[in-house]
Amino acid sequence: MRMRMQDVAPQDYRDAMACLGAAVNIVTTDGSAGRAGFTASAICSVTDDPPTLLVCINRGSSAYSSVTRNEVVCVNVLSARHEPLSRLFGGKVPADERFAAAAWSTLATGAPVLADCSAAFDCRIADTVNVGTHDVLFCRVVALQRFGCTDNLIYFGRAYHTVGVTDPAEAGPESALDAS
């Protein structure tokens, strides 16, 4: 027996989503369409063969045009010390001011890599699916850099929090999650 789908009010959905903790990332791009970036928590792993991330971007975002036209992104995983930078990239601040607030480098695609992020996933956009107000980007990881993940920044209950390990050795390359 198939259940009938019922409409869920957007505010009820947002309230329930506040119960879902998520890593905080800054997604960046650079290329002929310009340099841009935005704060995102709607990111997850799709598969490790080939390495692919899912990144959601609101089509109303100031970074949208640059991201979709450049067809490259870097997902910069933030640590606790990056909360102010996350707020900057999540606001209405011009792109040049956002990028001036931190040190950046690049990997394979030319998308900006935050110098002291926990990890950076440098990607080419392989596919895009339009859903409601957002595009879901399937991003093929072509390079990555891992700087250490001892105190990552998460967003939960409409607030920033820190999650991490007290012993940096616990954040080594062979974690239980890496094995899945």
Curated annotation (Swiss-Prot):
Which InterPro entries is this protein grouped with? Answer: Flavin_Rdtase-like_dom, NADH-dep_flavin_reductase, RutF, Split_barrel_FMN-bd
Recorded hits in SMART domains, A to Z, give: Flavin_Reduct
Instruction: Write out the GO MF terms.
Output: FMN binding; FMN reductase (NADH) activity; FMN reductase [NAD(P)H] activity; riboflavin reductase (NADPH) activity
One Pfam family this chain carries?
Flavin_Reduct
Main EC class of this protein? oxidoreductase
> So what EC number does this one have?
1.5.1.42
A biological process (GO) of this protein is: nitrogen utilization
Q: What keywords are assigned to this protein?
A: Flavoprotein, FMN, NAD, Oxidoreductase
Q: Does the keyword NAD apply?
A: yes
Q: Per the record's keyword annotation, is NAD included, yes or no?
A: yes
- Report which superkingdom the organism of origin falls in: Bacteria
* Catalytic activity entry: FMNH2 + NAD(+) = FMN + NADH + 2 H(+)
The UniProt entry, under PANTHER family, shows: FLAVIN REDUCTASE, FMN REDUCTASE (NADH) RUTF
Function field: Catalyzes the reduction of FMN to FMNH2 which is used to reduce pyrimidine by RutA via the Rut pathway.
Q: Which family does it belong to?
A: Belongs to the non-flavoprotein flavin reductase family. RutF subfamily.
Q: What is this protein called?
A: FMN reductase (NADH) RutF
Which species does the entry assign this protein to? Bradyrhizobium diazoefficiens (strain JCM 10833 / BCRC 13528 / IAM 13628 / NBRC 14792 / USDA 110)
Q: What is the lineage of its organism?
A: Bacteria, Pseudomonadati, Pseudomonadota, Alphaproteobacteria, Hyphomicrobiales
What is this protein's gene name? rutF
